[in-house]
Amino acid sequence: MNLSSLSFRLLATLLGACVVVAPASAERIKDLAQVGGVRGNALVGYGLVVGLDGSGDRTSQAPFTVQSLKNLLGELGVNVPANVNPQLKNVAAVAIHAELPPFAKPGQPIDITVSSIANAVSLRGGSLLMAPLKGADGQVYAMAQGNLVVGGFGAQGKDGSRVSVNVPSVGRIPNGAIVERALPDVFAGTGEITLNLHQNDFTTVSRMVAAIDSSFGAGTARAVDGVTVAVRSPTDPGARIGLLSRLENVELSPGDAPAKVVVNARTGTVVIGQLVRVMPAAIAHGSLTVTISENTNVSQPGAFSGGRTAVTQQSTITATSEGSRMFKFEGGTTLDQIVRAVNEVGAAPGDLVAILEALKQAGALSAELEVI
């Protein structure tokens, strides 16, 4: 055996050892949970988009657009008589919404989405005038203004016909709002950090507590319920941030997801979890197709006979039944076997939904069946 062959075998052995030792499905805490209180907040506002190329609101059908414009002009020192209602096509009333990210500070920009409220055909080319964005408490947290970016296209004729591509009545303004008010500091005055799992799972909570205690010392973390883990932390904000920086990178293997089958009855979409099993069962699958065709028969009387032309309908009904097939599931059948068996009999997605519902009703499906 030469030296190069020995080196290759040694390298292969070491790589194999590394594969065995490395955690199979370790995930970071930051991917499994979020810090309690650290979240975004919804903002909403109302405003006007101007500068549209004739694609704005039809003000005869949206009087609030004219009212908003008159109020705006009044604030700018332009008085419009109360009995004058300008018929404009380059203005649109819009709703504005955005998310105020955690720890946002005054002066920072955030993205906003602008949506038409009335009957504007398109917001392309428009500019949003300054509008306040309020939170759920009624306080103004940001001011929005800017030029819209619209991905769709729309046009409408005088006869009411219209052509549109995508959704031209919704646009975005990157960095279109400036934060004016900061949220209260969620890091002040508590001696614990709360971690909330994205999915309820007692096994994951238990493993998270064990992983944190292993990294920071026994008694650092405690389980509160199937979602929440409380971690002891210093009260100093700087020290808490340092702790969180280390804490969110702790790795653990989460618990297995529960066996579940999710069915969308409207679209025929079926999602089957990896741990779904089927108890022993036999299924027969077949289909019956009924075709109804209508033919019109006209009976024309002879000349000078005094008869009348008769029109009759002739219906032809044909029923065909494709060969029904039966397949059997043994105990502990896995996801791959279920899909393979159903595909072999040529079942459509709608048929698969019916088969899964029947299996659940018969007690042969060892999983939760959720229909959405």
From Swiss-Prot:
Keyword Cytoplasm in annotation: no
Listed InterPro entries: Flag_FlgI
Cellular compartment(s): Periplasm; Bacterial flagellum basal body
Tagged with keyword Signal: yes
Pfam families: FlgI
Alphabetized UniProt keyword annotations: Bacterial flagellum, Periplasm, Signal
Principal subcellular localization: periplasm
Signal peptide feature range: 1-26
A GO CC term assigned to this protein in UniProt: outer membrane-bounded periplasmic space
Any Gene Ontology biological process: bacterial-type flagellum-dependent cell motility
GO molecular function: structural molecule activity
Family: Belongs to the FlgI family.
Function: Assembles around the rod to form the L-ring and probably protects the motor/basal body from shearing forces during rotation.
Complex and partners: The basal body constitutes a major portion of the flagellar organelle and consists of four rings (L,P,S, and M) mounted on a central rod.
Protein name per Swiss-Prot or TrEMBL: Flagellar P-ring protein
Lineage summary: Bacteria, Pseudomonadati, Pseudomonadota, Gammaproteobacteria, Lysobacterales
